[in-house]
Amino acid sequence: MNTKKRQKTKAKLLKAVRSIIAKGQKASVSSITKKANLAYGTFYRYFKDLDEIYYEAIEELLFELAVKLERDLKNIYPAPLRVYVTWFTVIDFYKDKNTVTWLLEHPGKINKAFLDTQPMSEAWIEEAINDSELTCFTKENAEHYMKVRTYLFWMYANALQEILKGKETVDVYTDLMSAANIFNFPKNIHQTYINNSIRYFEEAQSNLL
């Protein structure tokens, strides 16, 4: 089989598992190959097990999420609000219980989900520091975020567990943000950012319907 055909077949398998993930269904070799319209044995020519294809599929989804966030949030003002919206989006992205279960069993991918959003967040924070109209944001706020994000990362796995228990994304997000004032804003400003980020996300979702 030539290289181009192999790549096409592998892409069909990955597309199939991504479709299954998107629908909140449980992936199996049988369901993946059936969705891809390929023979059962074809799967094992490209992937040694379900973990391997899940790993690659999640990798693709994470990359696309990072690109989408950078594109979709660039016009949100002020810049710190983008960081809040990003956390909401990353939590909501994994609300499917099968994917959440897999991620909790493979914490390396949780690390990846966290790390992929950080370069964007850091650029937005730098923008906020240099924004002369955003007088409430200082280097001290930025430094606080750099310190507290380790706590956020640690709490991210807990957030996924709460989703697995059936808790709504908005409630999981609100609890996380309430526990960690990410920029050490005054309480009323922090709450305003939480409310505005939820409103933005919900409006963006409704526009997709």
Residue ranges, per PLM feature:
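C-terminal peripheral helix-coil segments that are non-catalytic and often amphipathic
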Residues: 130, 165-209
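Basic, helix-initiating cap at the start of DNA-binding domains
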Residues: 1-26, 30-31
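Amphipathic alpha-helical segments used for helix-helix packing
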Residues: 88-115, 119, 126-127, 195-196
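Alpha-helical DNA-contacting segments of helix-turn-helix folds
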Residues: 47, 53-64, 102-104, 113, ...
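Amphipathic alpha-helical packing segments from all-alpha helical-bundle domains
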Residues: 109-158
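Helix-turn-helix
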Residues: 22-52, 56
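Hydrophobic alpha-helical connector segments
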Residues: 56, 70-96
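Solvent-exposed, amphipathic alpha-helical segments
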Residues: 12-23, 64-75, 151, 155-163
